[in-house]
Amino acid sequence: MQKLEKQYHIHCAEGDVGRYVILPGDPGRCEKIAELFDDAHFVSQNREYTIYTGTLLGEKVSVCSTGIGGPSASIAMEELHNIGADTFIRVGTCGGIELDVRSGDVVVANGAIRFEHTSREYAPIEYPAVANFEVTTALVQAAKALGKRTQVGVVQCKDAFYGQHSPERMPVSYELLNKWEAWKRLHVKASEMESAALFVVADALNCRCGSCFHVVWNQEREKAGLDQDMSEDTTSAVQVGVEALKRLIQADRAAQ
């Protein structure tokens, strides 16, 4: 591909973003996250990619939305890495699977099921989608320090949102329903759409990536008749992601 002054999709060049980047899916969430940075400013917006840059503890940091799913998320990571980013935290939403995962919880993923296809263009299916240990540790410590109810474990990643939520009407319903039962028996915490791709792409780029999510709903709790309310306030997950970045910055400085 022809070399461009700015990255083709995110419209950023070297110096526009920090080494540390938070990756929400929703462009509308970027400004909210940037408000927790110091000296934050708008950088660019193109397609699903909205970017702000600021500082934390004096270190340049950024937030870049990815849109929905692995394809657009992998593009964001590739292009951010091209201009100097190497540490990523996905902060997003998920739906609970295991019964003790409740609306409003924060889920930290230590691995992801590759029930999607972007990662298959980076690594064979036998290769696991595993979160970076340093980033995961920072997320867990941040959640505990902030007093958030937190779940740590494997998440399932898919390409089709309605394949999960309306599997019975799909021509491949037998596969979707059987695999969903397998995820339940394996005590998978939640379902979302980006982490499997991001973890594998990060490994291919020799970067660090972890994920934390706000639980919106748990359809298995609903089926079981357990109490829950839909929760769309992502503040807790955002706070955990930002606090984790601070801890990573401090740890990286101490290791120098």
Feature-to-residue mapping (PLM):
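Zn-dependent metallopeptidase/amidohydrolase metal-coordination segment
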Residues: 196-230
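Short acidic/polar active-site loop segments enriched in Thr and Asp
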Residues: 86-87, 189, 208
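Metabolite-binding pocket within alpha/beta catalytic cores that recognizes anionic/polar moieties
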Residues: 1-138
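Glycine-rich beta-alpha junction loops
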Residues: 27, 95, 156-162, 197, ...
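Flexible, glycine/charged-enriched surface loops at secondary-structure junctions
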Residues: 40-45, 147-154, 250-256
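His/Asp/Glu-rich mid-to-C-terminal helical/loop segments that flank catalytic regions of hydrolases
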Residues: 219-256
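Active-site rim beta-loop-alpha module in soluble metabolic enzymes
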Residues: 130-187
